[in-house]
């Protein structure tokens, strides 16, 4: 309406996964910045772009979205029950006046609400609590009651909403679609119902299918190998010939649990060298490490299997001299991805410890989660064996480390409460606070997402070696703890099946 004489054709400019960069460091030409209002913007490195033909390096493609825009303008697709212009006015007014709009609650979204707070939220308001107070009249006591959003892996909240059953005390097996049992394992719905019952009864005793777990473990072959990967994906490629969102495998950690009980941090790999594409070297180093013994290999979730399947495709399309050896290695320890047209039978398939926990073990302290970062602290609370062992320096309990001192103690207390080992990993700036300006003071390597961001930072040319090494050191510690956590979980399962 501002320019009625124009005919506008709308496009989105998107990163095209079918294109590849023909220069190194395309990502460095565009920087994300944040202003004091927590808004993000882009700084274009104009000096760097001056000598580059942007049309030649572009990994972007135009996508015509006329049909989608037409549906919005004609009010075929609506956010609110208003036509397009009135909707824009209403949303603008709501934002400018900081009003609560009061959209109807969608429980699937409420479960994942990004505006929940916890004890570390520094007096921030909880958007979750605000909505439920406004719309459902919940009071402070209601928020303390066990509710349906705590239940693991709920696929639909339709039945809960229809019956207005929001607290665990109000639900029945029917709300879970009925509890369906499966032989020799804890089924999904059985696990959910166990969680509900233990929460209501304030029962913190773990549930274990001991004989079934014992039978499964009897097929495992020592020495036991535990691996964890860290990877990065970016819409703007770091390297020449890399596609947008092409995964970069830059790190792994490898622990071995020997038959005599010795726990060895056997190897690790990390490549944060600016401008060096690490994917194939990553596989070579993993092959070198895992082929030193013939024992069972453990991952935690199917992530490592998926990563190696993607590396397999890259290697198959490469001209590497050891191409066949690397292909055979990957196929020996992985299953084909679900969407793969190829098929092979691994001789030494990786074992998913996440799936083992899911099928045979439930710990109420996890509140339904099977995340390694929830299972490990829960086991610390549950197992006197694990507590006693890891209350000692690692050099006293036959545990080696590549990144922690011999006197490192993994289990510590604060006011009688067990401290989550992951929270003991310090932010990278704590060691170099006065010397590092490139790293945000609020960032720390605390999960895979943070590791991915940290790797992206190492690919900027102006980062000093001091800064790059600080990130590298923190990444190594974090990844080593991940595989050690797997060992601890394995030790616990071994102990409870005696």
Where are these regions (language model features)?
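DEDD superfamily 3′-5′ metal-dependent exonuclease/proofreading module
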Residues: 1-498
